[in-house]
Amino acid sequence: MSAPIIAIDAMGGDFGPRNIVQASLACLTATPSLHLVLVGQASLIEELIARHGAVDRSRLRVVNANEAIAMDERPSQALRGKPDSSMRVALELVASGQAQACVSAGNTGALMALSRFVLKTLPGIDRPAMIAAIPTRSGHCQMLDLGANVDCSAEALYQFAVMGSVLAETLGVKKPRVALLNVGTEDIKGNQQVKLAAGLLQAAQGLNYIGYIEGDGLYRGEADVVVCDGFVGNVLLKSSEGLASMIAARIDTLFNRNLLSRAVGALALPLLKRLQTDLAPARHNGASLLGLQGIVVKSHGSASVSGFQSAIQRAIVESRENLPQRLKGRLELLLQNGQT
């Protein structure tokens, strides 16, 4: 595939374009084949670019957008009332073929609504789902939905499982193990929609469905793809990130109590740094909206520079793998087998 072109919503997120522009320039330096389009208030973006010195402008373009979507803005207002928002213009670049992917740290609800409107969903998919990598004991698993769909039918959960399995395959996992997140592993556990989804998955051909999984099983690495509704997934994701930050803070406090603990900490520092890097939320930042006729990656609104770089890197990988087309081909077969 030709060099990836990624459209960046430069005005999204809690910090506006400051971190986003810095992360974008760092990615350009790290990936010589990458091309970026920064979308937003052009004068402000150009000012931020100028502060960072020499930049290869042959691989960087700035597209002006006169409006920005607030983090607390209603999706309906973003959809109908702001046709020239940075988020919408970035998505339209993907729809028109001028970019292969869009990355935004903006309002999640607005991004979902605009993505569905501008890019449309793949055949057979009712609603896109948000998926991201969750660190586990043995590596990581792909988990969806992470907040795009608070209430989900059994059919939606089935579609999420199919999409998650296909994504895991594109990332090199052979016969990915697919599980439904539940309050227990027994057949009688779970709400009605989870039980109905389990029946659909058990009957599906071409899916390696292994049954229910509990939260602790997720972290033990017992599945490659874990499926749940967006309410449960978002709570689990935020709790995981908070737990990782708390553990890092407690370790730091423990090793700085006195001279002896600082000496022990100095000896353990290389291992602790490695653990901190492996579990850092910034490393795993970037959730994909699966099920669209285009690539969209959602970054945390509060992402650091390195965190937003991770989101851009995820978009690069999916662009190089031509993920929407790969999804489309596999979805046609799996959805037909599962719902005929």
UniProtKB/Swiss-Prot annotation:
Which cellular components does GO assign to this protein? Answer: cytoplasm
Kindly state which keywords UniProt assigns to this record, in alphabetical order: Cytoplasm, Lipid biosynthesis, Lipid metabolism, Phospholipid biosynthesis, Phospholipid metabolism, Transferase
Pathway linked to the protein: Lipid metabolism; phospholipid metabolism
Q: List the Gene3D superfamilies.
A: Isopropylmalate Dehydrogenase (3.40.718.10)
Q: What is its EC number?
A: 2.3.1.274
Instruction: Give its localization.
Output: Cytoplasm
- Which SUPFAM superfamilies does the record match to this protein? Isocitrate/Isopropylmalate dehydrogenase-like
Catalysed reaction(s)? Answer: a fatty acyl-[ACP] + phosphate = an acyl phosphate + holo-[ACP]
Membrane-crossing residue ranges in chain numbering: none
| InterPro entries xrefs | FA_synthesis, Phospholipid_synth_PlsX-like
Task: Look up the coiled coil feature and give its residue ranges.
Answer: none
GO BP terms:
fatty acid biosynthetic process; phospholipid biosynthetic process
Listed GO molecular functions? phosphate:acyl-[acyl carrier protein] acyltransferase activity
Q: PANTHER family annotated for this entry?
A: FATTY ACID/PHOSPHOLIPID SYNTHESIS PROTEIN PLSX (PTHR30100), PHOSPHATE ACYLTRANSFERASE (PTHR30100:SF1)
Quaternary structure per UniProt? Homodimer. Probably interacts with PlsY.
Q: Which family does it belong to?
A: Belongs to the PlsX family.
Biological role? Catalyzes the reversible formation of acyl-phosphate (acyl-PO(4)) from acyl-[acyl-carrier-protein] (acyl-ACP). This enzyme utilizes acyl-ACP as fatty acyl donor, but not acyl-CoA.
Q: What is this protein called?
A: Phosphate acyltransferase
**Where does this protein come from, organism-wise?**
Pseudomonas savastanoi pv. phaseolicola (strain 1448A / Race 6)
